Regions:
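Core-facing hydrophobic residues within beta-strands of well-ordered domains
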Residues: 2-3, 125
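Active-site nucleophile loop of the alpha/beta-hydrolase fold
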Residues: 6-16
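Alpha/beta-hydrolase
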Residues: 16-99
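Conserved strand-to-loop "acid loop" that flanks and positions the catalytic carboxylate
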Residues: 95-106, 132
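Conserved alpha/beta-hydrolase "acid-adjacent" motif
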Residues: 107-113
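Catalytic histidine-centered segment of alpha/beta-hydrolase-like enzymes
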Residues: 128-148
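Alpha/beta-hydrolase-fold serine-hydrolase catalytic core, especially in secreted/extracellular enzymes
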Residues: 142, 156-164
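Hydrophobic "lid"/C-terminal helical patch
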Residues: 147, 151, 155
């Protein structure tokens, strides 16, 4: 049983996403290769793609060091799914309180796409938060404490006393 749901860096249909539009151009490659190479420049691009400066360079370097010790490539499945299978979630089927977190500069999910998802959520106890100065990877950003504050506040909010 899920009591509450939090969606962060969520992508619904990908509508109006310039990042996904660019990735779709390479979809045949992603499908045929199964893996794509990664290096330090790739990791840097994850943090600089949407809005350079939202993550601390020391965090980016530590993240790159950690993942590059594990592998030099990664599966293409998430790219294939985001470019060819969205949407994979039907908001009308989510029956629990839901919080949607979106970074101000998130270049993958457009604000309007997420608002369209939000208004279709049937549960009245729902929230939408746009986080200032954050791009897609909210927990690795300079403003990460704001993310934790919003998350903690939502998850510890008392249940409503009155429900019509």
């Amino acid at each position: 049983h899920v009591a509450k749901l939090v969606l962060d860096a969520f992508v619904w249909t990908g509508k109006d996403s310039h990042t996904l539009e660019n990735r779709r151009k390479k979809l045949p490659d992603y499908i045929s290769l199964n893996r794509r190479p990664i290096d330090r420049a790739f990791v840097q691009s994850i943090f600089d793609r949407d809005h350079p400066g939202t993550a601390d360079q020391a965090t980016i370097s530590a993240f790159a060091d950690a993942i590059l010790t594990l592998d030099s490539s990664m599966p293409t499945g998430t790219y294939v799914d985001m470019c060819s299978k969205l949407p994979v979630v039907d908001p009308t089927q989510i029956k629990v309180p839901t919080l949607i977190l979106r970074g101000e500069f998130d270049g993958i999910a457009s604000l309007q796409d997420l608002i369209d998802f939000y208004v279709r959520l049937p549960h009245a106890n729902k929230q939408f938060s746009v986080m200032k100065g954050i791009s897609h990877a909210s927990f690795q950003q300079k403003n990460y404490k704001m993310v934790y504050h919003i998350l903690h506040s939502y998850l510890t909010m008392p249940d409503p006393i009155y429900e019509a």
